[in-house]
């Protein structure tokens, strides 16, 4: 294991105490969820694409609080559907993760780079 410098014990059993209140918060905002788009997003909990079901999406979001993130499964699921994988934001951490499973990931680290990259696609 690698010790990470984090602000809270995310994705561990220590987060179980907030699962019930978090479920309540998600239920309060459930009307703003567009579950038809859920199958376009991978779940950190399952490592697969979400189902178009409000109960499943909320269950996955709550479960990810106290369970390990399934990075490799997420990356493989994303790569299986994508013609090209892009990482948008500062730094290039995902590029290296994808490289470990043999997938090329183009990093887009600034606004001008994003404009150039996505103008081509």
Locate predicted features.
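Acyl-group transfer acyltransferase/transacylase scaffold of fatty acid/polyketide systems
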Residues: 1-121
């Amino acid at each position: 294991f690698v010790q990470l410098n984090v602000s809270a014990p995310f994705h561990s059993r220590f987060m179980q105490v907030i699962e019930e209140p978090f479920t309540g918060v998600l239920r309060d905002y459930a009307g703003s969820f567009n579950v038809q788009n859920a199958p376009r997003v991978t779940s950190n909990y399952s490592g697969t694409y979400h189902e178009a079901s409000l109960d499943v999406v909320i269950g996955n979001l709550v479960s990810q609080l106290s369970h390990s993130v399934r990075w490799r499964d997420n990356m493989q699921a994303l790569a299986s559907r994508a013609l090209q994988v892009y990482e948008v934001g500062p730094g290039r951490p995902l590029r290296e993760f994808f490289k470990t499973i043999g997938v090329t990931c183009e990093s887009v680290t600034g606004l001008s780079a994003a404009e150039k990259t996505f103008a081509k696609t």
